[in-house]
């Protein structure tokens, strides 16, 4: 088995908090120096690298003299604002030793949910890569709340991979990779060297939370790999404690767990729809509509809609769920939630008489729909 990183041209590397901080006591400058050296080495082989780095909140806690991670959202936001300054300074200094420019890019999931902002972020990152710059990406924790409370940079790494159509995502952690069970509790736990991303059994294997400094456990990494696979990107989960781990992966050495993408890339438009993390609404559809969407490749017609949930406008991305509540697809709606409630369970021929106008005969056209 050879590392998929060897053939990858464009790589997103995610480094967790525990690998860039001194056990939460501010940034570990020596560790960051090693990451800069390894990424500079990758750049020397012709690979493009985007770095997703945690550590801002931990650095802010150190600068503010806080020993424990606060629970108040505004205190977390303040720590992120203070710490982001130090994070950018250290990376700029360390990469500068190799003549490499860096760029700070702070994103929120909302940036990637809006189509125009999504395309702007994509264009900016691709331009930076073409200029030989290494983008350093982090969540903009200072202006968001849900992401600090529930989010993680594993997910952000997958979103960025899809955004720039990366070939591979490398998630570096303080664990060796994925085991069939928690090796600390189960002596029969076996290491998983390679598997297909999105395999349901993987989520059952993963579990447990991260450290008190970081937020992500193994499950978030498995889900990130599943998301990255939708754009055809392979994921490697490996220990950042391994010496020269990036260089060895790029040389083809199999380190950690490889989660391979089972399918090819989605189109850019459908990838954008699939990457929405926060949807304004969803429709419950009947079993017949589920079958037509998932097996027949058909559009969603109003007659197949059983219930409309949430409030949304025409042109927004909404979820389509089975009668049991499982999301099966998502897409761009041709009608608002108020209009959808009026035309639900009705044939398309009655839309105009009910609403007084006809946008489209479909609630969601198949060209604007992606299966999940």
Swiss-Prot record:
This is Glutamate 5-kinase. The keyword Acyltransferase does not apply. SMART domains: PUA (SM00359). Signal peptide: none annotated. CDD domains: AAK_G5K_ProB (cd04242), PUA_G5K (cd21157). The gene is proB. It comes from Cupriavidus metallidurans (strain ATCC 43123 / DSM 2839 / NBRC 102507 / CH34) (Ralstonia metallidurans). Substrate binds at residues 54, 141, 153. Pathway: Amino-acid biosynthesis; L-proline biosynthesis; L-glutamate 5-semialdehyde from L-glutamate: step 1/2. Keywords: Amino-acid biosynthesis, ATP-binding, Cytoplasm, Kinase, Nucleotide-binding, Proline biosynthesis, Transferase. NCBIfam families: proB. InterPro entries: AceGlu_kinase-like_sf, Asp/Glu/Uridylate_kinase, G5K_ProB, Glu/AcGlu_kinase, Glu_5kinase, Glu_5kinase/COase_Synthase, Glutamate_5-kinase_CS, PUA. Catalyzes the transfer of a phosphate group to glutamate to form L-glutamate 5-phosphate. It is found in: Cytoplasm. ATP binds at residues 14, 173-174. Its EC number is 2.7.2.11.
């Amino acid at each position: 088995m050879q590392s998929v990183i060897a053939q990858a041209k464009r790589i997103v590397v995610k480094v967790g908090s525990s690998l860039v901080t001194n056990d939460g006591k501010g940034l570990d400058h020596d560790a960051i120096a090693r990451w800069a050296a390894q990424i500079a080495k990758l750049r020397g082989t012709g690979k493009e690298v985007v770095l997703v780095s945690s550590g801002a909140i931990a650095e802010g806690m150190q600068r503010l003299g806080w020993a424990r991670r606060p629970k108040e959202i505004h205190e977390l936001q303040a720590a992120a604002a203070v710490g982001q300054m130090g994070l950018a300074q250290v990376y700029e200094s360390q990469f500068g030793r190799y003549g490499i420019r860096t760029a700070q890019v702070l994103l929120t999931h909302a940036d990637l949910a809006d189509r125009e902002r999504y395309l702007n972020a994509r264009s900016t990152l691709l331009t930076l890569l073409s200029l030989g710059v290494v983008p350093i990406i982090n969540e903009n924790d200072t202006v968001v709340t849900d992401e600090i409370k529930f989010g993680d940079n594993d997910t952000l790494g997958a979103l960025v991979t899809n955004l720039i159509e990366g070939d591979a995502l490398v998630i570096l952690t303080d664990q060796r990779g994925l085991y069939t069970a928690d090796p600390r509790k189960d002596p029969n736990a076996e290491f998983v060297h390679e598997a297909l991303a999105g395999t349901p059994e993987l989520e059952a294997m993963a579990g447990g939370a991260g450290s008190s400094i970081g937020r992500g456990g193994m499950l978030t990494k498995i889900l990130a790999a599943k998301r990255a696979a939708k754009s055809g990107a392979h994921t490697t989960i490996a220990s950042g404690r391994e010496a020269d781990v990036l260089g060895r992966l790029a040389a083809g050495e199999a380190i950690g767990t490889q989660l391979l993408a089972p399918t090819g890339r989605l189109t850019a438009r459908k990838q954008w729809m699939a990457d929405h993390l926060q949807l304004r609404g969803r429709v419950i559809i009947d079993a017949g509509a589920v079958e037509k969407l998932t097996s027949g490749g058909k559009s969603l017609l109003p007659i197949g809609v059983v219930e409309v949930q949430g409030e949304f406008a025409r042109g927004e991305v909404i979820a389509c769920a089975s009668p049991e509540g499982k999301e099966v697809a998502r897409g761009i709606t041709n009608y608002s939630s108020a209009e959808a409630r009026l035309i639900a369970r009705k044939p398309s021929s009655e839309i105009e008489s009910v609403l007084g106008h006809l946008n489209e005969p479909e609630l969601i056209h198949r060209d604007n729909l992606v299966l999940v």
